[in-house]
C-alpha cells in the first residue's frame, strides 16, 4: 500500500511544480493566490490555527525536532489507525490505485484541492526561506502558517508524541481533504512547525526536496533524517516519462546509500576444488633424486693400469751417473815448475837475514860527554845563592801617631819584659795636655790593656 501512495504523491508534487514554474520571481503574489485557493476549497480553519505570538511556534518546533524520523511503516500507520471512519472510507480509493494508472484515469485529478495543496507546499518552503534570511515580514509568516495548517487538516487528531511531523506533510498529498476537522488537531500541527528552510531557497530557486517528492517535513527540510525515507519507497519506472521540466534528485544521505547498496551475500568459495598455484600439489609426493643415490665401494683393479707419460716403461732404468767412479791418484810434484821462475831461487836467503844484533854494555862515564857542557857545571852555584835573607821585626807601633790629636800622651808598653819598666813616651805625641800618668793610675792601666789587646791581635 505504500507504493501506490508514493506514486500519487510524486504526481501531485510535479503538478504543483509545473503550475508554479512561471512564478519564481513573484513570491508574494504566489503566496496570496495560493491562500485564496485554499479558502475557496473550503479548507479555512478557525483563528486558532494562526501561530501564536508568545512563542508556541518555537516550542512546537523544538518538540518535533526531538522526535525520531519515522519509517515507512510509521508513515502508513496513521492512515489505518488514527483516522475517523469517514476519513478511512474517503481515503480507501486512493489506497487501491494500481501502479500503471495515472491520476486522471483514477479520478483523483478532478479534486480541486490537490494542486492547491502542492502549491501550498512550495509556498510554505519559500516562506520558510524568507523567514530564515530575515527578509520576510510577520504577515508572511502568518500566511505561511495558515497554509501549513490547511495542508495538515486532513490528518486525524493524534497525540503530539506519537508520530513525527514528517507524516503530517505526506498524508495530505495522498488523501482528499476533509472539511470537518477538529480545531485542536490543527493547533497541534501549527505548534510543531519549525522555521528553518533549505540553503538552496536563498537564491530564489524552489527547494528540491520539497517541490519534487514532498517527503521532507517542514520541521527538518534538507536534513538527512527527513530524506532517509525516500529510497525505501522507490518510484515505479512508469512515472519517469512524466518528469518533463527539471529532473531534481534529492541529495543522497548516508542511510539511503546503505539501503541501496545492499548486495547479495557472496557465497563461500569451495575449498575442496581449489587448485594449487603453479602445480604445487602435483609434486606433493615428489622425492628428490639425491635421496636414492647409493655409494658403492668397489676395489680398483690396478693390474691393467698404465702409467702416465710412459713412466712404467722406464721403471727399471738406472741413471747413467750412478756408475761414475772417482779415482784418487797422488800428484807428482817433482816435475812441477814454479811460476815466474820461483823454483830457481828456492834456496835464496835474503840479505838482511844474516845481521846479528849484539848487546854491549856502554860505559857512559868514560866515553859519554854531556851535551852543552852540562857536566862541567855540575858544581855551579848560582850567583845569588850565597845571600842571606834577614828577617827584622817591625815595631811600627812605637812610631805610630793618632789620626786625631786628642792631647793625651800614649804610653806604649812593650810586651817584651825588660829591666826598664818605666813607660816610654811617644816622641811624636805632643804633651800639651799635661796629663801625668803617675797622677792618673786608671789611665795607665787602661792604656796597658789596650796595648796588650792590640799586641795579641798582631797589629
From Swiss-Prot:
Presence of keyword Coiled coil: no
Swiss-Prot/TrEMBL Tau/MAP repeat ranges: 262-292, 293-323, 324-354, 355-386
Any Gene Ontology CC annotation: plasma membrane
Omega-N-methylarginine sites (modified residues): 155, 367
Modified residues (N6-methyllysine): 277
Top-level taxon in the UniProt lineage: Eukaryota
Modified residues annotated as Phosphoserine in this record: 46, 61, 185, 209, 213, 216-217, 220, 232, 253, 255, 280, 303, 307, 311, 323, 342, 370, 374, 414, 418, 422, 427, 434, 440
UniProt xrefs under InterPro entries: MAP2/MAP4/Tau, MAP_tubulin-bd_rpt, Tau
Modification sites for Phosphotyrosine: 18, 29, 215, 412
Location in chain, cross-link Glycyl lysine isopeptide (Lys-Gly) (interchain with G-Cter in ubiquitin): 44, 272, 277, 285, 299, 316, 329, 335, 339, 349, 361, 365, 371, 387, 393, 403
Cysteine-cysteine disulfides: 309-340
Modified residues (Phosphothreonine): 69, 71, 111, 153, 169, 175, 181, 223, 230, 235, 249, 421, 445
Biased composition (Low complexity): 212-232
Membrane topology: Peripheral membrane protein
Entries under Pfam families matching the protein: Tubulin-binding
Stretches with biased composition (Polar residues): 61-71, 419-434
Broad class of where this protein is predominantly found: cytoplasm
Post-translational modification remark: Polyubiquitinated. Requires functional TRAF6 and may provoke SQSTM1-dependent degradation by the proteasome.
Stretches for region Disordered: 1-274, 416-435
Tissue specificity of this protein: Expressed in neurons.
Record keyword Thylakoid present: no
List of residues that carry N6-acetyllysine: 163, 243, 277, 299, 308, 316, 329, 335, 339, 349, 361, 365, 387, 403
Function: Promotes microtubule assembly and stability, and might be involved in the establishment and maintenance of neuronal polarity. The C-terminus binds axonal microtubules while the N-terminus binds neural plasma membrane components, suggesting that tau functions as a linker protein between both. Axonal polarity is predetermined by tau localization (in the neuronal cell) in the domain of the cell body defined by the centrosome. The short isoforms allow plasticity of the cytoskeleton whereas the longer isoforms may preferentially play a role in its stabilization.
Name of the protein in its database record: Microtubule-associated protein tau
Organism placement in taxonomy: Eukaryota, Metazoa, Chordata, Craniata, Vertebrata
Amino acid at each position: 500500500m505504500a507504493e501506490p501512495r508514493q506514486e500519487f504523491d510524486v504526481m501531485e508534487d510535479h503538478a504543483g511544480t509545473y503550475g508554479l514554474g512561471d512564478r519564481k520571481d513573484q513570491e508574494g503574489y504566489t503566496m496570496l493566490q495560493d491562500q485564496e485557493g485554499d479558502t475557496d476549497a473550503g479548507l479555512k480553519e478557525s483563528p486558532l490555527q494562526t501561530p501564536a505570538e508568545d512563542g508556541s511556534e518555537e516550542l512546537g518546533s523544538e518538540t518535533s525536532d526531538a522526535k525520531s524520523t519515522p519509517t515507512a511503516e510509521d508513515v502508513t500507520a496513521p492512515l489505518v489507525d488514527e483516522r475517523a471512519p469517514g476519513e478511512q472510507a474517503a481515503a480507501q480509493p486512493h489506497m487501491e490505485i494500481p501502479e500503471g494508472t495515472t491520476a486522471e484515469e483514477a479520478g483523483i485529478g478532478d479534486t480541486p484541492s490537490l494542486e492547491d495543496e502542492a502549491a501550498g507546499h512550495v509556498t510554505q518552503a519559500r516562506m520558510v526561506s524568507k523567514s530564515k534570511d530575515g527578509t520576510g515580514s510577520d504577515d508572511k509568516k502568518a500566511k505561511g502558517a495558515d497554509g501549513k495548517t490547511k495542508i495538515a487538516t486532513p490528518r486525524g487528531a493524534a497525540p503530539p508524541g506519537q508520530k513525527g511531523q514528517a507524516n503530517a506533510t505526506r498524508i495530505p498529498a495522498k488523501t482528499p481533504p476533509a472539511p470537518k476537522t477538529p480545531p485542536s488537531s490543527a493547533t497541534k500541527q501549527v505548534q510543531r512547525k519549525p522555521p528553518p528552510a533549505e540553503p538552496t531557497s536563498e537564491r530564489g530557486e524552489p527547494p528540491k526536496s520539497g517541490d519534487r517528492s514532498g517527503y521532507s517535513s517542514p520541521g527538518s527540510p534538507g536534513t538527512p533524517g527527513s530524506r532517509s525515507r525516500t529510497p525505501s519507497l522507490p518510484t515505479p519506472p512508469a512515472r519517469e516519462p512524466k518528469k518533463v521540466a527539471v529532473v531534481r534528485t534529492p541529495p543522497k544521505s548516508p542511510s539511503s546509500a546503505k539501503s541501496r547498496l545492499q548486495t547479495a551475500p557472496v557465497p563461500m568459495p569451495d575449498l575442496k576444488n581449489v587448485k594449487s598455484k603453479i602445480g604445487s600439489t602435483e609434486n606433493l609426493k615428489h622425492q628428490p633424486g639425491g635421496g636414492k643415490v647409493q655409494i658403492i665401494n668397489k676395489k680398483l683393479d690396478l693390474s691393467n693400469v698404465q702409467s702416465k707419460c710412459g713412466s712404467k716403461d722406464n721403471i727399471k732404468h738406472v741413471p747413467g751417473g750412478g756408475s761414475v767412479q772417482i779415482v784418487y791418484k797422488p800428484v807428482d810434484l817433482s816435475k812441477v815448475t814454479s811460476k815466474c821462475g820461483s823454483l830457481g831461487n828456492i834456496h835464496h836467503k835474503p840479505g838482511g837475514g844474516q845481521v846479528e844484533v849484539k848487546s854491549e854494555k856502554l860505559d857512559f862515564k868514560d866515553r859519554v860527554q854531556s851535551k852543552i857542557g852540562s857536566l862541567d857545571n855540575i858544581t855551579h852555584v848560582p850567583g845569588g845563592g850565597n845571600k842571606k835573607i834577614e828577617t827584622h821585626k817591625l815595631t811600627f807601633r812605637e812610631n805610630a801617631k793618632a789620626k786625631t790629636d786628642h792631647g793625651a800622651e800614649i804610653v806604649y808598653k812593650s810586651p817584651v819584659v825588660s829591666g826598664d819598666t818605666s813607660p816610654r813616651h811617644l816622641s811624636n805625641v805632643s804633651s800639651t795636655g799635661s796629663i801625668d800618668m803617675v797622677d792618673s793610675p786608671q789611665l795607665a792601666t787602661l792604656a796597658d790593656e789596650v796595648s796588650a789587646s792590640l799586641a795579641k791581635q798582631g797589629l
